[in-house]
Amino acid sequence: MHLLLRNLVSWEQLHNADPGYTVVIASMSALAPLVVANLRLAARQANARMRELILVVDCPADRIPDTIHAAVHECSEFMRIRVLGYTDWQHFVTCRLKWGWVYSWLSWSLAIAHSATRAVIIHDLDALPIFPGLFESLYDNWLDSGAEFCGIQRYRGNGVSDEMNLVTTFELALDAGYLRERFRPFDLFNKLRLMEGRLIDFDTMLHVQMQSRCRALREVFQSLLVHPSAVVCQCTDFVAGRTTFAGRSHNLLMLPYFFFLGGDSAMLFTISRQLDRVHRETIRLLGRRLHTDGILPSHWAWMEKQIRRLEQAVVGYSRPEVAEYLAGFIDRAGEFRTVGREIGPLAVNDS
C-alpha cells in the first residue's frame, strides 16, 4: 500500500502566505447530503478572517454530485469556497484500497498543498458546528499557542501516551507552511514505529507531530459542535463490506438525520420504519445489512441527545419527522435516556 501512496500527492513550499486561515473538509461523494449539511452550517459561522474553505471530494471533478455543486453555489454568498477533486489515478488507488484513512490523508494533503494561508483548520465532515464563532476561536487558539499543531482533544490509544502530547486531527489547527517546508505529504500518513520497546501505531499526522517543535491542546466545550466521531470511517468500512458491526457499537444511525439535514429525507423515513420493532437487531442501510445489537442503551441515549442538540440549534425544535425517527432511539435507551432529564450547560430539552 505504501508504494501506491508514496507519490500520490505532492506540494511545494508556501511563500508569501495570505493572512487569516483556511478551513478544510475532506468529503465523500457518496455522502453528498452530509456535505450539504456541513457546508450550510459552516456558512452560518462568523468567518471574518477565513481566507477560504477548501472542499476536497473523493472523485474526479467531473463526477462531483450536482447536489454538492448546488450547495457550494448557495453557500458562496457567505464564504469563499474552492472545490477540489481527485485525479483519475488518485481515484483509482483510493477505490482499490477503500480505506477511510487513505481518503482522509489524501484529501487533507491536497487541501494543505493548495492552501494560501499558513493556518489550516481540519474540519471533519461528520463534525457539525453549532457555535457561530467556532472557527474564529480555533484560529485564535492557534495564534496564541504559537504551536505547529493546536488541537482540541488529546490523542489516546494505539500505544500513544499522554506524555507524547499529541492531539487528534478533528478541528485541528496546523501550520501548513511548516508542513510544506519540512515534510512530504506521505510523511503525514499512518506510521508503525518501535519506540522504547513499544510498538506505536501513529494515526494520520501523529508522526509528524512527534517531530514538531511545539504542539498545544486547547479544549473547547462539546456543546459548540455535534461530532459523533468516526462516522465517515465506519461508513467506509461498512460500504466496503469489511464489517456489519455485529456485536459492536457505532454511530452510523446518525447518518439518516445528517442526510435529512442536507435535504435528503428518504433514508430517515426508511430507517424510522425499521426501528419501529424494538427487538430488531439488524436494519438495511445503504443497501447492506447493518447490526444494531452492539449499541448499548446509553449510546442510543447519547445519539438522541446529539441529534436533538443539532436540530434545536438549526430550527429551534425537533421537527415531526425527526421526533418520529428518534422514537426508536428512546425505546432502546430506556432508563438511560438523558434528554429532558439533565440540568446544566450540556443539557438538552425534550422539544
Give residue ranges: language-model regions:
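Terminal low-complexity segments of carbohydrate-biosynthetic enzymes
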Residues: 267-351
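Short aromatic/hydrophobic "clamp" motif used to bind/position activated sugar donors
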Residues: 120
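The conserved acidic donor/metal-binding loop of glycosyltransferases
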Residues: 124-128
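Conserved donor-nucleotide/metal-binding helix-loop-beta segment in metal-dependent transferases, i.e.
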Residues: 132-158
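Short, well-formed alpha-helical segments that are part of the catalytic scaffolds
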Residues: 31-46, 67
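Active-site-proximal specificity loops/subdomain of glycosyltransferases
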Residues: 63-114
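A conserved hydrophobic helix/loop-capping motif in glycosyltransferases and polysaccharide synthases
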Residues: 21-31, 45, 56-58
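Catalytic core and acceptor-binding pocket of nucleotide-sugar-dependent glycosyltransferases
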Residues: 171-274
